[in-house]
Amino acid sequence: MATIKFPIVFSVVCLFLLCNGSLAQLLSQSTSQWQSSRRGSPRECRFDRLQAFEPIRTVRSQAGTTEFFDVSNELFQCTGVFVVRRVIEPRGLLLPHYSNGATLVYVIQGRGITGPTFPGCPETYQQQFQQSEQDQQLEGQSQSHKFRDEHQKIHRFQQGDVVALPAGVAHWCYNDGDAPIVAIYVTDIYNSANQLDPRHRDFFLAGNNKIGQQLYRYEARDNSKNVFGGFSVELLSEALGISSGVARQLQCQNDQRGEIVRVEHGLSLLQPYASLQEQQQEQVQSRDYGQTQYQQKQLQGSCSNGLDETFCTMRVRQNIDNPNLADTYNPRAGRITYLNGQKFPILNLVQMSAVKVNLYQNALLSPFWNINAHSVVYITQGRARVQVVNNNGKTVFDGELRRGQLLIIPQHHVVIKKAQREGCSYIALKTNPDSMVSHMAGKNSIFRALPDDVVANAYRISREEARRLKHNRGDELGVFTPSHAYKSYQDISVSA
């Protein structure tokens, strides 16, 4: 009898473990976007006075400039973000480097090429050439001295693209266009990938790293080198199989060009060229691809098995300015485009996301708060009136943001934005790959979710006033038309 019962008991135990594991997977899947592995601030923070920021320092390189925001300000230190704005001139090359935090780059202007180098990935871009008969005869004798150009995949970017750069991944950038590249870089220092102290560190593979280190008062202002500069010439030449002279060149001891250098005759790169139609098709396909990946993850669970998308094939850039990709659109108010880990899978690695908002003349956003992220708002066009309120009901910011200014909005703080007469566009870079907001008005808002009696008793108003409060903006989502235009539209609807 015991031998008969054992398989039954064993089967029951296995079934229990299977069900328990499936339940745990479902629970983790449903709560993953609410949770974050991001570290909090090690200091006590008081977000009682927010301010608009502009760069406080500009450092000139040979072929561009790097503009730094005030990293010593409490808002940057408490939210754990580091922000720079770079201008790369035509034929300018941002030297290869990596940092200790994950970074999102938004391209405000221009176009160019970038090349993140993922460890362990093959050099899939290879140069093909024909050999002469003499070369073929000598091939066996000089095989070790014959090389061809090969490198990892390079990525073209343009205005409106968001480029994701994981922590510790070396990358470079080159401007092959006719106009300067202007881009805003936001690095999340409190990202779980950073196991160093909570401050930004750039590790340059070339040039002299004299720029970023000077932002910290307790860092030496001289003798800053690239990572090769700390090795002895003998060990470096032996490790890389090069001469001592070349090893000294790698250390760039007398290189005063800065982090953006000029390539006089342009870069010669192995790259495929796509037609305009192919580029447009790629935008649509990338959107569909992200949605398909999300649906597959919903079916398979939140645990990654490493086969869905590897380092070597993942996309590192996605356009967020294309009107055809808008998630919310109001022809009288504007549009909103979300870029999260569901659409752009690499964001799950960098643990950040982006939102692009275009508001028309005098349009406004529904009051909202960020549920699971801090938000770095950068104005790209126009002006906007912005108010932010903290947990005590205190107005911690009430002012106008204009083009080129930046505002950090802490998690859970309630914000309202209204475009001025010329309209407004901004990019919001957030510290969660699946950032969520809670709206206070319109469709899917907190008021619409509350019963009439709860609203009436909470604010000591009548039921009729409560219903009006819930449904006044009931046909709009996210972006609202100006009050005069909205009333006119309501009057037309009623008369019709």
UniProtKB/Swiss-Prot annotation:
What is the species of this protein? Oryza sativa subsp. japonica (Rice)
Among PANTHER family, the record links this protein to: 12S SEED STORAGE PROTEIN CRB (PTHR31189:SF35), OS03G0336100 PROTEIN-RELATED (PTHR31189)
Q: Which Pfam families match?
A: Cupin_1
Keywords of the record: Disulfide bond, Seed storage protein, Signal, Storage protein
Tell me if Heme is a UniProt keyword of this record: no
Quaternary form? Hexamer; each subunit is composed of an acidic and a basic chain derived from a single precursor and linked by a disulfide bond.
Q: Where is the Cupin type-1 domain?
A: 50-248, 318-467
Please give the CDD domains that the UniProt record associates with this protein. Answer: cupin_11S_legumin_C (cd02243), cupin_11S_legumin_N (cd02242)
| Similarity section | Belongs to the 11S seed storage protein (globulins) family.
List the protein's name. Glutelin type-A 3
The UniProt entry, under SMART domains, shows:
Cupin_1 (SM00835)
One Gene Ontology molecular-function label: nutrient reservoir activity
Role? Seed storage protein.
- Cysteine pairs forming cystine bridges in this chain are C45-C78, C121-C312
Q: Name one GO biological process term.
A: seed development
Q: Where is the signal peptide?
A: 1-24
What is the superkingdom listed in this entry's lineage? Answer: Eukaryota
Gene symbol of the encoding locus: GLUA3
